[in-house]
Amino acid sequence: MSDIKKVVLAYSGGLDTSVILKWLQDVYKCEVVTFTADLGQGEELEPARAKALKAGIKPKNIYIDDVREEFVRDFVFPMFRANTVYEGEYLLGTSIARPLIAKRLIEIVNETGADAICHGATGKGNDQVRFELGAYALKPGIKVIAPWREWDLMSREKLMAYAEKHGIEIDMKHKKGGSPYSMDANLLHISYEGRHLEDPAAEAEESMWRWTVSPEKAPNKAEYLDLEFAKGDVVAVNGKKLKAHEVLALLNELGGKHGIGRLDLVENRYVGMKSRGCYETPGGTILLRAHRAIESVTLDREVAHLKDDLMPRYASLVYNGYWWSPERKALQVLIDHTQQTVNGVVRLKLYKGNVIVVGRDSKTDSLFDSTIATFEDDAGAYDQRDAGGFIKLNALRLRIAANLAGRKAGKPVAKKAAAKPVTKAVPKAVAKPVTKAVAKAAEKPVAAKATAKPVKAPVKKPIAKKKG
């Protein structure tokens, strides 16, 4: 342990990382640099600075960075261009924040000359994988300290006891009723784990939810919302141009007011176990619905289907911590290329937990052609007779398979009606132009042909005999 002289700690000021800070000082006897990221979690971050100072951290070794714009612009928006959802439900609010934190940890290591990084992820979770894969991808030789894989403080109760023993200030409001929820928040979502949520059959308490009202208590009047997209990203809300992080903050506010974005799920962790978590993702829920709506009129069918095929793989890469991997980067290039035409406006209606698409339009890139799609007279824009051949060609393999199945089952196979012989049309002679000479000739009476005289047979003469 003595070879580590300085470590950069991902520090939130909460229970886990406050205990880790003291533990690093006691066990590793090293200099600690703290990094606290402002990801839009909605908490005052200055208390984290005060806690770090109280723990003996030098002011120059305390980093508190506002990374909200970078987070949404370079991580959340690229992920939503892919319509990313993990296992059909989870919008990856925690997962997508980890690669940015790992990136900033390595940058601070390079700035301060630190030997290692340290994180507060448990040995059971996904975050340990995400932090460390990111760190190794960006700085292959970096050392990593993961206290949960080293110490004997294996429960939140033991953490609180350690904190009390060493005079570490923590929120103790749940002390009598049990451990507090394990929560993680950023501009995209807030998550809840632990306590009675460890029973997947138990309903979450209403008092747990922080960002959204219950749909039952949401306003009785719907609210309309216009989102403008440019190359797959929202750039304006109700006609007002906004920065990326401002867009998501506003959508969180509007969605929370209407009870949008609550989620209770059991997910499959990368380490192999199932885990129950509750999430509030109001802005992300609105963003996903709107993005799919604008793509519905601006993306070619096969391109859209290809994106849908690739999305689960992309989601797994993000969830499992492979944001900085070559395969995720390659997929991103493809996805971003598809977004060049994803421009336009989507109109939504927010009502009691629902995001309802009521309109979508692109003045420059819409592939929706009403002259072809109409149920009225299309003036020949689409020849419906063409559909017959299209259907027969696409049915060919189905008919062949059905015939084969019939033969195997011993059923008579319907014979195809014999085709009628095709007669070749005799080409009509092309009429020659009538000349004056021909016309005059036509006016003269036609002379009757002379009757052919009968041909007389030749008379044979007798052959004279020779004298003896």
Curated annotation (Swiss-Prot):
GO biological process, one term: L-arginine biosynthetic process
Entry keyword annotation includes 4Fe-4S: no
InterPro entries: Arginosuc_syn_C (IPR048268), Arginosuc_syn_N (IPR048267), Arginosuc_synth (IPR001518), Arginosuc_synth_CS (IPR018223), Arginosuc_synth_type_1_subfam (IPR023434), AS_cat/multimer_dom_body (IPR024074), Rossmann-like_a/b/a_fold (IPR014729)
This protein's UniProt keywords: Amino-acid biosynthesis, Arginine biosynthesis, ATP-binding, Cytoplasm, Ligase, Nucleotide-binding
Region described as Disordered: spans on this chain: 445-468
Binding site for L-citrulline: Y90, S95, N126, R130, S182, S191, E267, Y279
Bias (Basic residues) ranges: 458-468
EC number: 6.3.4.5
Annotated binding of L-aspartate, by residue: T122, N126, D127
Protein name: Argininosuccinate synthase
